[in-house]
From Swiss-Prot:
InterPro entries: Ig-like_dom (IPR007110), Ig-like_dom_sf (IPR036179), Ig-like_fold (IPR013783), Ig_sub (IPR003599), Ig_V-set (IPR013106), IgV_Light_Chain (IPR050150). V region of the variable domain of immunoglobulin light chains that participates in the antigen recognition. Immunoglobulins, also known as antibodies, are membrane-bound or secreted glycoproteins produced by B lymphocytes. In the recognition phase of humoral immunity, the membrane-bound immunoglobulins serve as receptors which, upon binding of a specific antigen, trigger the clonal expansion and differentiation of B lymphocytes into immunoglobulins-secreting plasma cells. It is found in: Secreted; Cell membrane. This is Immunoglobulin lambda variable 3-9. It comes from the Eukaryota. Residues 51-67 are annotated as: Framework-2. Residues 21-115 form the Ig-like domain.
């Protein structure tokens, strides 16, 4: 049976010395195959911080898909893109494929507070 929709879940993680920094995100995002998925990660003035995105499939280690807001590591398809401004960082997956179904983690790195 062909996949008709993907369920993308999101977990958030903050790295830095300010443990009280809070991130908000949808528990899941559903998208039809071939359509565009947008997964958000919200935080106060998150646009001033570095956001990294990871994809994790069951039984596998996380894979970095976007680093420092909008950069793709080698081997990651151009369908994956990122943006970060104001209070929201967004991971965009264009032309969604069945293989994109996974957990997606946003990691926020605040270099101004890290030691």
């Amino acid at each position: 049976m062909a996949w008709t929709a993907l369920l993308l879940s999101l977990l958030a993680h903050f790295t830095g010395s300010v443990a009280s920094y809070e991130l908000t995100q949808p528990l899941s995002v559903s998208v039809a195959l071939g359509q565009t998925a947008r997964i958000t990660c919200g935080g106060n003035n998150i646009g001033s911080k570095n956001v990294h995105w990871y994809q994790q499939k069951p039984g596998q280690a996380p894979v970095l898909v976007i680093y420092r807001d909008s950069n793709r590591p080698s081997g990651i398809p151009e369908r994956f893109s990122g943006s970060n401004s104001g209070n929201t960082a967004t991971l965009t997956i264009s032309r969604a494929q069945a293989g994109d179904e996974a957990d997606y983690y946003c990691q926020v790195w605040d270099s101004s507070t890290a030691h």
